[in-house]
């Protein structure tokens, strides 16, 4: 499943 938010954005 994809991450709800990206830390390394």
Swiss-Prot record:
GO BP annotation list: neuropeptide signaling pathway
Domain of life: Eukaryota
Homology family: Belongs to the allatostatin family.
Species, as recorded: Carcinus maenas
Primary role: May act as a neurotransmitter or neuromodulator.
Subcellular location: Secreted
GO cellular component, one term: extracellular region
Record-given protein name: Carcinustatin-10
Positions carrying Leucine amide: 9
This protein's UniProt keywords: Amidation, Neuropeptide, Secreted
């Amino acid at each position: 499943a994809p991450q709800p938010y990206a830390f390394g954005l």
